[in-house]
């Protein structure tokens, strides 16, 4: 309901939200109660004689059947009736197939005979389970089930005593017996399931020991379940109220309503019934048959068959995909769609209709580019615009426009389609005969056509990240495609080859406001995914910019003029031309400088920038113009290209966004495109065949290179044939060969490519596109010109397909380049047929890959999002999920948002100790250096003051500590970190803004720097709180930034490098603080979804299988998408598990020792070192069959240490491979030992010497002595020795580990190539140095054993098997490992994702203390609500579980709320807005009855004529551009950050600001006719929202009666205070008194002219004479809405220069001038009495009291009683607070400026009980009203909340002071002698006290008739917030004040600091504004 307006006819009240959803199983009774078909449905037919049949399947009581009919139950028609359930009484109960498994579990937990729980509920284990599984009933059942599984006897009462293994005293036992477990002690059957039937079988029961097996009928189960008690139900995880076990058996079957199973009417034929109806018919048929058979007493087997069939039908109705059961089919053979199939899957009910729906107000068509649109616009075809509508409410301001649209109707554009009257009637203008007759009234809605400037959401699928849906402004254009700016295609990932996009038109102003403030394209320029812009300059603009900014581009005057025409922000000044003679010429760079916004500073390089130049001698000159410098918004040097204008971090666009804001950046994009594209039109850019031709020398080169490459390949082939090729370690011969060939060919391609590149001229158009980065790469050029190169399939050369050859055209076994896919032609030359075929093979693979990848990554993304969708930043800044579990204590561990951080280098990390000291230590000994950098007085101070020197030493010490810390955090010395606030750039900005001359000494005191930085870092708070934990957390969160801050803003660098002045330094600190605060992550931000998208989107870009074929000896690991899948699935068996083993000490540097360790790790079996084996029959060892062994065998047999007699004649001879033995450092002895250890005495093993030429093992079986005996006696079936030996042989070769770790099959050893694996050490000089050390990488993992090996570095050694790390090292380690692995996967192909997203995923997976996979097995096993789980996967299973256990869903997550159509607690939905009812009193009615509100009416009338400063007010001074305007500060908790996105916008109470619009309301939605340019404050008439729109508020409408609920009821006490003289208890007040006519149009109990107490008294208008005829309040001529009284009518504009208080038109009693009258427009800032900008020239308070404003300190100093020296006002007196003269700070409700404060009204006597600080005027409970909040200051910008001196209860302030007593007769307001003109009332008499009733505090300072205060006096400047005569700097004669003379045309009351050019703005204000 929220979002749009109410549907027609419905109430406008919001519906109550659903707070939780309770699941359960329906009991049979409830089903019958709910059913509308009494007696159940008995007939399988639907109709009888053409009528629906009662009791049939289309029972008319169940819902509407015909379109025209009505429902018999609720009499609703088809749209109204929701349908009603019926029921079928089943003849016999059947199992519910959804609960079958649950049924079995419960059966196994309770006794088969007496239904008691098999485990006593007093068992401590059960108690433990109950305690542990609170709120997780499913867990409880699982645990109880595990306990009961082992029990096969139901424990009886007698075994009680010894049950817990504890002897219990007799008494206890009796007790337990009584409340008894008292089982029956019988044996329990095993429950088995087959199909849909359950069997119970007993094993050996005592009585008769044969087995017994019976079929368990559902009745029997029902009986067992029925007897389970409620307590035991609870133990079983059921919830007896919602789900008893016996309800899981179906006895009464509910029949779904007709609307769920509608019949399809085919033309001509009968109705086609829904699948469900068919199924129900089957059930009813078989049910009736079963009932008949039972009654007729049919045979048991017949009934059993029937039951079986019934069971089948009921089961297939629920689930038709049951394993092991036939499908229920229709006659055609199509399986029926069961209830389960309706819910599950993507197209099912949950995902297809609840989570995602089709929507109205959307459009889709093809997109085309249009560079002339702004990036946030979208061109919409007129045909679409005329069809899509937006409902606009009619107000007095838009009535004429809407009336005109209605007149045009639907036929012409722009027009309107419908009118919705305020009673909900729709008038369709398409069919209305004469739309022009229709008259609109305020409150109607008009559905008008979409028009220019509407806000829409534009989207392109797939929506991979939040930049795929952005807000655009509509621009109606002809023809039929959407047009969009080229730069926006990047985030949408769109191109114009036929892509279509979707457009959605939001239907409510709230939605609109949100899109405008949160989702507009310019706000999305920088992505939080990788903190860089996502939009850059592309295509022709980019090509052109590179050409345009070259050194030799000059433009003539005419050209310059033409280009400037396209520069929307041009200020009219043409810069000085670069060349004057012979004729003026401008350079391209100069024109580009005009486009660059603001004072941006930036240094980048051009794409062709040579790296060596930066250190070379010409680094400042940049010969190729390749160094880009933008300084102060001017392009000084350099050619711009993709690096500076593309989507890279730190590009010009990025800096513009961060420094200038999104709006200016938007213009930057538009201006570049319009200007540059139009230059390109003149310049031209083309490409042709000519660009692809190189010179003949190059072609010669290319031929030679290819020839040589072929020759090389042939050589390698020959080597391989001749077996001369040495395999590289870790590779087979074939792999080595392939690698070498590949390398040769790739080198050839690269070499030819680079020679082709070199041959191209500077003006080549291919080259210009590549260089600018617009299209293509170097490889593309070289493929066009030189060689296409090697084609690969699956990372290898084209494989053999046809009998050892690739194509039939080649000979067999041809390994040459041509036949294996090397294409030696270029695209220009054209490919030969075979080349073409190979090229196509390579290309095809890419296509398949892409297709497969899309599906894979789409699913990954969905899982990621589902697992993190509800993770958000809460208002305590923690990151939590929907069940309020903390996932992170601060988002990203630093609490900052991803879009606002940048890459920065930490200055102190890298430099050596010497360099560090030189750069950072403030050297106060070197006087000469000091004089160069600091001013003289500072030098003296520094040199002489020891305290200062200590401070500076301490500063350096601190930095040294920081450096130590950093070197622990970044041990590799890699210091690129993401931090907010780019300090170096901010300093540069400061130097430019304050015009710092880096050659002059600075006036910035070093101590000021040190202290400033200290103070600043105290202000940067991420974690509030003073407890040690919070302090530690705060330190951790801001550690890096603080280190960065201290090292950049250290005194030495400030003095030497930056030379900032004191002023500039202050600005810098302020800027850092505000930027830092803006970077903090917003509460309500859905960071979970953000992280999921940030990871899913790069995954989509990843290629599926990443091959790297140059793998020399690096082992290959899974990468890309497959690896990502492994990680988030937490697969137990990764494809390539691997350890990276780092070594310690010597072994790391010494290859031999490293090899030792390698051998210790690598698993070696005998087979790996065996050359060959043989079995011989060799009965006589002394003369062996193998002659060569004779010699050494004899040695053994001469002196045998074994029983020669037992030796078997069979011999196993193993010959070992010497090379492998030495490789693995094995000796024969070790092997023999292993064999002996394994087989012991059963084998005899002898071996020869390690140095023998053949290494031989001889193995024989030893026969035991007993064996010998047995053989003769009995022939046992024994294996023959030779067979046995053969078995031993295979066992030995494969299973016997010689050394190493079984899991580790192979170990590679190599020296690291990349720095990240080298060992980084810090030398004693403090420099980083990378050492090459040997690294082992393994196939297979065994972390535990490897870590315990000696010489292995246990700290750095890691595994890539996540599960293993978890088991070995625990959860924290696995979190880090997971983060590293994810980082590797993503960074492998060069992407970068901000750490915070990876961290959030890792934390989500590990925050429960175990690994949660991002699959249904992880996500759906969490404690989230069932609705969320069922929206992910396993829909029906989850819902069944939830029902069986009676779970409930607390509706806290995103999915749940979306399903139920509620606002999810996300973003703007995670807080509430409170309306401050008090503020509503100040709302103004919009007088709708003023004559002339017709066509041109409002213009002059509402707002005064345009010339008056108010009409022409400029948007620049509206309160929300004015951080310092306390008018807004007063009611908004975030003063000073008016520009902070989201602070003011979300300020909960901003809605009724001093101006009718709160900053949160976008000015766009109430066009103020008087001043089209002004967003609001100039309109005193916009009421507080909802005011004027409801008819009950219009004073002239009959409904406005004083007692109407919306009106102002005079009796309501809360209303009384607003009229000072209105005292409900005053005796003469009676509602019937003659001058109180409630129906008079002017009646307003709060209007001063209505004086209930005495006709002659109106305290606020002393000149009011009751006898003046025009003032009889009931007289018809006096109506506040009559034109002459319109408070804004031109003659009243108090600010109009001609206005003078004495002018005849000035009538102080006009209602608009009574400060206490609510109709006195307080909603415009110029009228708000509490706003400092309140213009005191308005005579809005009693002007006849000559010296009337006593509390204002600048009050006429000559008044005797208020002379500033009088003790009661002396600035030193304790109760005087100069900064808030009239505000009582300690009482939130006391504001003398509020008209309602009238101390004499009895209800306001401060001592009377009703006067409480909670007085409604300032409800302190409204969020922004914390009286102690410093920003709460209604009247004075300087207000101090703690000043005790103004508390009405403070002794000095007693209203009972003798002079003044509210009850004394002298002050009774009704006493006749009290008349403002009576002599006793002399304001100068001392008894006039500020609390006296006539004192109108709303004007702080001005008395119009007093000669001293004429408003034209030059010193009178009441609105400057600084103005306070007591402030020391202010001297009333100072000329500063003159700028603020209210009559000077620049003065406008709505802005305290308006005259922007005036020097009077003091730096304080400007600080606040930044």
Curated annotation (Swiss-Prot):
Entry note: cofactor: Two Mg(2+) ions are coordinated by both the catalytic residues and the nucleic acid substrate to enhance substrate recognition and catalytic efficiency.
Modified residues (N6-methyllysine): 1838, 1859, 1866, 1873, 1887, 1922, 1936
Outcome recorded upon mutating residue 1603 to H: In NEDHIB; uncertain significance; moderate; no effect on cell viability
Residues the record lists as binding RNA: 67, 460, 499
Sequence repeats: 1593-1599, 1600-1606, 1608-1614, 1615-1621, 1622-1628, 1629-1635, 1636-1642, 1643-1649, 1650-1656, 1657-1663, 1664-1670, 1671-1677, 1678-1684, 1685-1691, 1692-1698, 1699-1705, 1706-1712, 1713-1719, 1720-1726, 1727-1733, 1734-1740, 1741-1747, 1748-1754, 1755-1761, 1762-1768, 1769-1775, 1776-1782, 1783-1789, 1790-1796, 1797-1803, 1804-1810, 1811-1817, 1818-1824, 1825-1831, 1832-1838, 1839-1845, 1846-1852, 1853-1859, 1860-1866, 1867-1873, 1874-1880, 1881-1887, 1888-1894, 1895-1901, 1902-1908, 1909-1915, 1916-1922, 1923-1929, 1930-1936, 1940-1946, 1947-1953, 1954-1960
SUPFAM superfamilies (alphabetical): beta and beta-prime subunits of DNA dependent RNA-polymerase
N6,N6,N6-trimethyllysine: residues bearing it: 1866, 1873
Modification N-acetylmethionine, positions: 1
One Pfam family here: RNA_pol_Rpb1_7
Sequence positions bearing Asymmetric dimethylarginine: 1810
Residues the record lists as Phosphothreonine modifications: 1840, 1854, 1863, 1870, 1877, 1885, 1894, 1912, 1915, 1919, 1926, 1929, 1933
Entry GO MF terms: DNA binding; DNA-directed RNA polymerase activity; hydrolase activity; kinase binding; magnesium ion binding; microfibril binding; promoter-specific chromatin binding; RNA binding
Residues with PTM Symmetric dimethylarginine: 1810
Low complexity biased stretches: 1546-1568, 1608-1959
Residue span of region Disordered: 1546-1970
Keyword Cytoplasm: yes
Positions of modified residues (Omega-N-methylated arginine): 1603
Keywords in alphabetical order: Acetylation, Chromosome, Cytoplasm, Disease variant, DNA-binding, DNA-directed RNA polymerase, Host-virus interaction, Hydrolase, Intellectual disability, Isopeptide bond, Magnesium, Metal-binding, Methylation, Nucleotidyltransferase, Nucleus, Phosphoprotein, Repeat, RNA-directed RNA polymerase, Transcription, Transferase, Ubl conjugation, Zinc
Effect on the protein upon substituting residue 1866 to R: Loss of acetylation and loss of regulation of growth-factor-induced gene expression
Residues annotated as binding Zn(2+) 2: 111, 114, 154, 184
Recorded domain comment: The C-terminal domain (CTD) serves as a platform for assembly of factors that regulate transcription initiation, elongation, termination and mRNA processing. The trigger loop allows entry of NTPs into the active site, switching between an open and closed state with each NTP addition cycle.
Family in the record: Belongs to the RNA polymerase beta' chain family.
Name of the protein in question: DNA-directed RNA polymerase II subunit RPB1
Lineage: Eukaryota, Metazoa, Chordata, Craniata, Vertebrata
């Amino acid at each position: 309901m929220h979002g749009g307006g109410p549907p027609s006819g419905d109430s406008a009240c919001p519906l109550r939200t659903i707070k939780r959803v309770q699941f359960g199983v329906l009991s049979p009774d409830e089903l019958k109660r709910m059913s509308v078909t009494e007696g159940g449905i008995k007939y399988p037919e639907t109709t009888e004689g053409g009528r629906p049949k009662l009791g049939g399947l289309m029972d008319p009581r169940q819902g509407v059947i015909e379109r025209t009919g009505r429902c018999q139950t609720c009499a609703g028609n088809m749209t109204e009736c929701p349908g009603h359930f019926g029921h079928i009484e089943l003849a016999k109960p059947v199992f519910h197939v959804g609960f079958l498994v649950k049924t079995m579990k419960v059966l196994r937990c309770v006794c088969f005979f007496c239904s008691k729980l098999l485990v006593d509920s007093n068992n401590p284990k059960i108690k433990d389970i109950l305690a542990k599984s609170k709120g997780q009933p499913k867990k409880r059942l699982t645990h109880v089930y595990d306990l009961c599984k082992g029990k096969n006897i139901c424990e009886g009462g007698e075994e009680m005593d010894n049950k817990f293994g504890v002897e219990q005293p007799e008494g206890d036992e009796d007790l337990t017996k009584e409340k008894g477990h008292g089982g029956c002690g019988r044996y329990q059957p095993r429950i088995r399931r087959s199909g849909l039937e359950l069997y119970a079988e007993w094993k050996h029961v005592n009585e008769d020991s044969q087995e017994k097996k019976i079929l368990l009928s559902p009745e029997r189960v029902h009986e067992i379940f029925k007897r389970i008690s409620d307590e035991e139900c609870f133990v079983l995880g059921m919830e007896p109220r919602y789900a008893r076990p016996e309800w899981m058996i179906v006895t009464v079957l509910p029949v779904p309503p007709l609307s769920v199973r509608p019949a399809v009417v085919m033309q001509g034929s009968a109705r086609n019934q829904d699948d469900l109806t068919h199924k129900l018919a089957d059930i009813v048929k078989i049910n009736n048959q079963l009932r008949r058979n039972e009654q007729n007493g049919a045979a048991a087997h017949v009934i059993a068959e029937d039951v079986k069939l019934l069971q089948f039908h009921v089961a297939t109705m629920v689930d038709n995909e049951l394993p092991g059961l036939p499908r229920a089919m229709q006659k055609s053979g199509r399986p029926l769609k069961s209830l389960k199939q309706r819910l599950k899957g993507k197209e099912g009910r949950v995902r297809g209709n609840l989570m995602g729906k089709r929507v109205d107000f959307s459009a889709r068509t093809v997109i085309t580019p249009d560079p002339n649109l702004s990036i946030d616009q979208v061109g919409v075809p007129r045909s679409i615009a005329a069809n899509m509508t937006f409902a606009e409410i009619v107000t007095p301001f838009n009535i004429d426009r809407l009336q005109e649209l209605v007149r045009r109707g639907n036929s012409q554009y722009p027009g309107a389609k419908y009118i919705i009257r305020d009673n909900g009637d729709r008038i369709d203008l398409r069919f209305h005969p004469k739309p022009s007759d229709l008259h609109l009234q305020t409150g109607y809605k008009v559905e008008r056509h979409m028009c220019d400037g509407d806000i829409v959401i534009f989207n392109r699928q797939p929506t991979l990240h939040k930049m795929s849906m952005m807000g655009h402004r509509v621009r109606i254009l002809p023809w039929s495609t959407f047009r969009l700016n080229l730069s926006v295609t990047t985030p949408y990932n769109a191109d114009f080859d036929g892509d279509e996009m979707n457009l959605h038109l939001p239907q409510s102003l709230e939605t609109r406001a949100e899109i405008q403030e949160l989702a507009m394209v310019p706000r999305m320029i920088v992505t939080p995914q990788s903190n860089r812009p996502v939009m850059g300059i592309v295509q022709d603009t980019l090509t052109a910019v590179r050409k345009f900014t070259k050194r030799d581009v000059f433009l003539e005057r005419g050209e310059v003029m033409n280009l400037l025409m396209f520069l929307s922000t041009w200020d009219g000044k043409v810069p000085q031309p670069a060349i004057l003679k012979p004729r003026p010429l401008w350079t391209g760079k100069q024109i580009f400088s005009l486009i660059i916004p603001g004072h941006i500073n930036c240094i980048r390089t051009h794409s062709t920038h040579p790296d060596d130049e930066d250190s070379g001698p010409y680094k400042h000159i940049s010969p190729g113009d390749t160094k880009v410098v933008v300084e102060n918004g001017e392009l000084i040097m350099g050619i711009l290209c993709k690096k500076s204008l593309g989507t890279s971090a730190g590009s010009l666009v990025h800096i513009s966004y961060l420094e200038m804001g999104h709006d200016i950046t938007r213009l930057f994009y538009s201006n570049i495109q319009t200007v540059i594209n139009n230059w390109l039109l003149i310049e031209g850019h083309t490409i042709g065949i000519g660009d692809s031709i190189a010179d003949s020398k190059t072609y010669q080169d290319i031929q030679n290179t290819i020839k040589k490459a072929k020759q090389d390949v042939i050589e390698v082939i020959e080597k391989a044939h001749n077996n001369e090729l040495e395999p590289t370690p870790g590779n087979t011969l074939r792999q080595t060969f392939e690698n070498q060939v590949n390398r040769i060919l790739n080198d050839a391609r690269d070499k030819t490519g680079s020679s082709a590149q070199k041959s191209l001229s500077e003006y080549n158009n291919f080259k210009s596109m590549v260089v600018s980065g617009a299209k293509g790469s170097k490889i593309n050029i070289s493929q066009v010109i030189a060689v296409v190169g090697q084609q690969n399939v699956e990372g290898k050369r084209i494989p053999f397909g046809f009998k050892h050859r690739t194509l039939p055209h080649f000979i067999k076994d041809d390994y040459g380049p041509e036949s294996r896919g090397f294409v030696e032609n270029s695209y220009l030359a054209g490919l030969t047929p075979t080349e073409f075929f190979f090229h196509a093979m390579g290309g095809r693979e890419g296509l398949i890959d892409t297709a497969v990848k899309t599906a894979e990554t789409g699913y990954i993304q969905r899982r990621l999002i589902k697992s993190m969708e509800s993770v958000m930043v809460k208002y305590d800044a923690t990151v939590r999920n929907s069940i309020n579990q903390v996932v992170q204590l601060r988002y990203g561990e630093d609490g900052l948002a991803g879009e606002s951080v940048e890459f920065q280098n930490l200055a102190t990390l890298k430099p050596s100790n010497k360099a560090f000291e030189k750069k950072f230590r403030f050297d106060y000994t070197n006087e000469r250096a000091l004089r160069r950098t600091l001013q003289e007085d500072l030098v003296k101070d520094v040199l002489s003051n020891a305290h200062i020197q200590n401070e500076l030493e301490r500063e350096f010490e601190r930095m040294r500590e920081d450096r130590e810390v950093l070197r622990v955090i970044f041990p590799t010395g890699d210091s690129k970190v993401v931090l907010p606030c780019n300090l170096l750039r901010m300093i540069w900005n400061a130097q430019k803004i304050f015009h710092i001359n880096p050659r002059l000494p600075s006036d910035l005191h070093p101590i000021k720097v040190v202290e400033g930085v200290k103070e600043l870092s105290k202000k940067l708070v991420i974690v509030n709180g003073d407890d040690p934990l919070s302090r530690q957390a705060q330190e951790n969160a801001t550690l890096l930034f603080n280190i960065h801050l201290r090292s950049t803003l250290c005194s030495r660098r400030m003095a030497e490098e930056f030379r900032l002045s004191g002023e500039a330094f202050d600005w810098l600190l302020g800027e850092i603080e505000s930027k830092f605060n803006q970077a903090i992550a917003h509460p309500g931000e859905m960071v979970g979804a953000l992280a999921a998208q940030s990871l899913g989107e790069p995954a989509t870009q990843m290629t599926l299988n990443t091959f790297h074929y140059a793998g020399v000896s690096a082992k290959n690991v899974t990468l890309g998408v497959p690896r990502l899948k492994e990680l988030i699935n937490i697969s137990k068996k990764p494809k390539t598990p691997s350890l990276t083993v780092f070594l310690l000490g010597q072994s790391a540097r010494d290859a031999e020792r490293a090899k030792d360790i390698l051998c210790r790790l690598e698993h070696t079996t005998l087979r790996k070192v065996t050359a060959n084996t043989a079995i011989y029959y060799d009965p006589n060892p002394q003369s062996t069959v193998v002659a060569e062994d004779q010699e050494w065998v004899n040695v053994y047999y001469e002196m045998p240490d074994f029983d020669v007699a037992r030796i078997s004649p069979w011999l196993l001879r193993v010959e070992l491979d010497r090379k492998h033995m030495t490789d693995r450092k094995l000796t024969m002895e070790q092997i023999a030992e292993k064999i002996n250890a394994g087989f012991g005495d059963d084998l005899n093993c002898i071996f020869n010497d390690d140095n023998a030429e053949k290494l031989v093992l001889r193995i024989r079986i030893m026969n035991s002595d007993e064996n010998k005996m047995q053989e003769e006696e009995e022939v046992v079936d024994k294996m023959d020795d030779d067979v046995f030996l053969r078995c031993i042989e295979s066992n030995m070769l494969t299973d016997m580990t010689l050394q190493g770790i079984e899991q580790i099959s192979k170990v590679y050893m190599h020296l690291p190539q990349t720095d990240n694996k080298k060992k980084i050490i810090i030398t004693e000089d403090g420099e980083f140095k990378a050492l090459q050390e040997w690294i082992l990488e393994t196939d297979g993992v065994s972390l535990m054993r490897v870590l315990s090996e000696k010489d292995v570095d246990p700290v750095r050694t890691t595994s890539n098997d996540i599960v293993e790390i978890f088991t070995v090292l625990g959860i924290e380690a696995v979190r880090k490992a997971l983060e590293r692995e994810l980082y590797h996967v993503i960074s492998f192909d060069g992407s970068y994702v901000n750490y915070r997203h990876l961290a959030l995923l890792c934390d989500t997976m590990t925050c429960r203390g175990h690994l949660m996979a991002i699959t249904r097995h992880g996500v759906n096993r969490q404690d989230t609500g069932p609705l969320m789980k069922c929206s992910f996967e396993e829909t029906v299973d989850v819902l069944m579980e939830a029902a069986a256990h009676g779970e409930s869903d607390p509706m806290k997550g995103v999915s749940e709320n979306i399903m139920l159509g509620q606002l999810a607690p996300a973003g703007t939905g995670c807080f509430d807005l409170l309306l401050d009812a008090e503020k509503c009193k100040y709302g103004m009615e919009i007088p709708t009855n003023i004559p002339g509100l017709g066509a041109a009416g409002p213009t002059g009338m509402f707002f005064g004529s345009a010339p008056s400063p108010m009409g022409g007010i400029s948007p620049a001074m509206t309160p929300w551009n004015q951080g310092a305007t306390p008018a807004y500060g007063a009611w908004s908790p975030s003063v000073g950050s008016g520009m902070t996105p989201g602070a003011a916008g979300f300020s909960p109470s901003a809605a009724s600001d001093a101006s009718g619009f709160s900053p949160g309301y976008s000015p766009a939605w109430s066009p103020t006719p008087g001043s089209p340019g002004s967003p609001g404050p100039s309109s005193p008439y916009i009421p507080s929202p909802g005011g004027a729109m409801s008819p009950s508020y219009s004073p002239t409408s009959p409904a406005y009666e004083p007692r109407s609920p919306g009106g102002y009821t005079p009796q309501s006490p809360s209303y009384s205070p607003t009229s000072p003289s209105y005292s409900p208890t005053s005796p003469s007040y009676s509602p019937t008194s003659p001058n109180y006519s409630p129906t008079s149009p002017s009646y307003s109990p709060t209007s001063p002219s209505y004086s209930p107490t005495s006709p002659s008294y109106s305290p606020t208008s002393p000149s009011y004479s009751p006898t003046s005829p025009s003032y009889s309040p009931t007289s018809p001529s006096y109506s506040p809405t009559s034109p002459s009284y319109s408070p804004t009518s031109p003659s009243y504009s108090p600010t109009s220069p001609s206005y003078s208080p004495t002018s005849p038109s000035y009538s102080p009693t006009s209602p608009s001038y009574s400060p206490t009258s609510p109709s006195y427009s307080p909603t415009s800032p110029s009228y708000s009495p509490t706003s400092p900008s309140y213009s005191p020239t308005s005579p809005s308070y009693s002007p006849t009291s000559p010296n009337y404003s006593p509390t204002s300190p600048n009050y006429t100093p000559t008044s005797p009683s208020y002379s500033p020296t009088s003790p009661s006002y002396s600035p030193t007196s304790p109760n005087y607070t100069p900064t808030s003269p009239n505000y009582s700070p300690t009482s939130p409700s006391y504001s003398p400026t509020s008209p309602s404060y009238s101390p004499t009204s009895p209800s306001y006597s401060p001592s009377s009980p009703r006067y409480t600080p909670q007085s409604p005027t300032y409800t302190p409970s409204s969020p922004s009203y914390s009286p102690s909040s410093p920003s709460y200051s209604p009247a004075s910008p300087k207000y101090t909340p703690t000043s005790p001196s103004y508390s009405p209860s403070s002794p000095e302030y007693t209203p009972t002071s003798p002079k003044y007593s509210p009850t004394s007769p002298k002050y009774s307001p009704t006493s006749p002698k009290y008349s403002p003109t009576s002599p006793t009332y002399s304001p100068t008499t001392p008894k006039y006290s500020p609390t006296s009733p006539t004192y109108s505090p709303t004007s702080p300072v001005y008395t119009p008739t007093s000669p001293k205060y004429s408003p034209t006096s030059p010193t009178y400047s009441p609105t400057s917030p600084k103005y306070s005569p007591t402030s020391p700097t202010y001297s009333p004669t100072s000329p500063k004040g003159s700028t603020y003379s209210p009559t000077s045309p620049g003065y406008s009351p709505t802005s305290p600091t308006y005259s922007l050019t005036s020097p009077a703005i003091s730096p304080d204000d400007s600080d606040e504004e930044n």
